[in-house]
Swiss-Prot record:
Family, per entry: Belongs to the universal ribosomal protein uL4 family.
Cellular component GO terms held in the UniProt record: ribonucleoprotein complex; ribosome
Keywords: Ribonucleoprotein, Ribosomal protein, RNA-binding, rRNA-binding
Pfam families, A to Z: Ribosomal_L4
NCBIfam families, sorted: rplD_bact
Location of the region described as Disordered in the Swiss-Prot/TrEMBL record: 50-78
Gene3D superfamilies to which the protein is assigned, alphabetical: 3.40.1370.10
The UniProt record lists the keyword Coiled coil: no
Protein known as: Large ribosomal subunit protein uL4
UniProt source species: Mycoplasmoides gallisepticum (strain R(low / passage 15 / clone 2)) (Mycoplasma gallisepticum)
Lineage: Bacteria, Bacillati, Mycoplasmatota, Mycoplasmoidales, Mycoplasmoidaceae
Gene behind this protein: rplD
One example GO MF annotation: structural constituent of ribosome
């Protein structure tokens, strides 16, 4: 059974909970993680790149020089791909769709594997739901991370929108803030430490059930 500690904003342990087994897998599936991250990366490619083919380049309709008696290789147009300023052979066109489909089973397996990987490496910590600030305070978040001895990439996962917590995290270059339903497999893998609120963890369990 995997247990994690829930910390408050001062870095003190308030509770220890047992992670629901529906959130974990017995073995981390690296291929599922790879497929999920690849699909996410490819989905961000707009596909608006475009090049001109030989027939689309302006000018150069005239034969550069006569066919014979020049001692040079015959040429039909300066729009040919091997000419500077000529068309591009087999260049990209904007009608290409880079997106690949990952079915729900693999996507779910990838998410669980990412969580399991973080738990196994002691990179998954909990935060209490009752984190409330009167105003944004970068100093408070920096102090929390110092207490937890976390000085690398941190992902804070909230169960509901918390503007003060979000703004407090925004000024720290190594800290990112996301709502539980915005977190992807890539977000989990990229982070060196995941700090998730208790209700955010429960929401993940319900979604994966």
């Amino acid at each position: 059974m995997s247990k994690i500690k829930l910390f408050d904003l001062s870095g003190k342990v308030q509770e220890e909970i047992e992670l629901n087994q529906k959130l974990l897998v017995s073995e981390v599936h690296k291929q599922a993680i790879f497929d999920a991250i690849l699909a996410e990366n490819l989905s961000q490619i707009q596909g608006t790149h475009s090049t001109l083919k030989k027939g689309e380049v302006s000018g150069g309709g005239k034969k550069p020089y006569q066919q014979k008696h020049t001692g040079r290789a015959r040429q039909g147009s300066i729009r040919n791909p091997h000419y500077v300023g000529g068309g591009i052979a087999f260049g990209p066109k904007p009608n290409r769709n880079y997106k690949i489909k990952v079915n729900k089973k693999v996507s779910s397996l990838a998410f669980k594997s990412a969580i399991t990987s973080k738990v196994n490496n002691n990179e998954f910590l909990g935060l209490v739901d009752s984190i409330k600030q009167d105003k944004p305070s970068t100093k408070a978040i920096a102090k929390l991370l110092k207490e937890l001895k976390v000085n690398k990439k941190v992902l804070i996962v909230a169960f509901e929108k918390n503007e003060n917590l979000e703004k407090s995290s925004a000024n720290l270059p190594n800290v990112s803030y996301k709502l539980w339903n915005q977190v992807s497999v890539k977000d989990l893998i990229d982070a060196n430490c995941v700090l998730a609120q208790k209700s955010a963890i429960n929401n993940w369990v319900e979604r994966l059930n």
